[in-house]
């Protein structure tokens, strides 16, 4: 599954690195594309990963998800 999350709080490459670290730790995540310019994060994943787990990881990384 491929999902795009709108994350308006992404402001720099440090944010991107932190997002990639937190979301990348979730089993089942196969691709992450966090964009400062688009203020979005595209994630491809399979079970056991879920949208809720990814959203929680984004929040744990200090980001706001809308």
Swiss-Prot record:
Pfam families per the UniProt record, alphabetical: HMA (PF00403)
Keyword Lyase: no
Name the UniProt record assigns to this protein: COP-associated protein
Domain of life from the UniProt record: Bacteria
Alphabetical UniProt keywords: Copper, Metal-binding
Function, as annotated: Part of a cation-transporting system which is associated with copper export out of the H.pylori cells.
Segment forming the signal sequence: none
Claim: Metal-binding is one of the keywords in the record: yes
Native source organism of the sequence: Helicobacter pylori (strain J99 / ATCC 700824)
Entry binding sites for Cu cation: 12, 15
NCBIfam families: chaper_CopP, copper ion binding protein
Gene Ontology biological process: copper ion transport
HMA domain boundaries: 1-66
Molecular function GO labels: copper ion binding
